[in-house]
């Protein structure tokens, strides 16, 4: 079970918890990411409507996403709320928890290869990476995208080769793909050649940038689709803007017309390309 680097959760933090005991007035829950820590959820924090029977909402052994509303480390008290968690927040937290589980499994594999136990791995790798990146899997993604050197200085050097091997094999790098369409016309005998040359130059120039992939697809005159894959949405938008400006300039100088038609972004995950 993945655990956080700090001893206590912070107020406002979302946590994954397992219902331990249910009473008429509230419930006690174990905090999965904080071993040995127990939180209390008053019946008034279970739902936004009046709760006649708390067991209609909570049962022993059930896993929930709760919001931490009060923390008193001196007394060891942690108060939780279920009603203050939106469906979107719940979904995002569960995804984060799954990423932490995957990071934990990968770190266990690395520790096994080095002949270390997980407590050593947790102290030497998990804690510093979480403190720097916020979550360990985000650090692994950064290493997958930019090279294992990004972890240097945060973890002992002996971990780097085995972490590189595992990250290269198992870590998926999230990418954003956006697409749009161009309507391009050049009323000249060599109009098709002018359009083709403009698209190829724009594509090749963009593809020289790291982690950028641009592809054009002919949809039938006068329409052309562009697909841009980048590490994040903002970079993809920046590339599209640069390409559009270049294409519109070249086509206009050639006496033609070009119009950019936008579409929605798509998010996908791809395996890191081997270098």
UniProtKB/Swiss-Prot annotation:
Keywords: Initiation factor, Protein biosynthesis, RNA-binding. Gene3D superfamilies: EIF_2_alpha (3.30.70.1130), Nucleic acid-binding proteins (2.40.50.140), Translation initiation factor 2, subunit 1, domain 2 (1.10.150.190). It holds the Pfam family EIF_2_alpha. Residues 12-83 form the S1 motif domain. One of its GO terms (molecular function) is ribosome binding. The keyword Cytoplasm does not apply. The keyword Protein biosynthesis applies. HAMAP family: eIF_2_alpha. Heterotrimer composed of an alpha, a beta and a gamma chain. eIF-2 functions in the early steps of protein synthesis by forming a ternary complex with GTP and initiator tRNA. Belongs to the eIF-2-alpha family. This is Translation initiation factor 2 subunit alpha. It comes from Pyrococcus furiosus (strain ATCC 43587 / DSM 3638 / JCM 8422 / Vc1). The gene is eif2a.
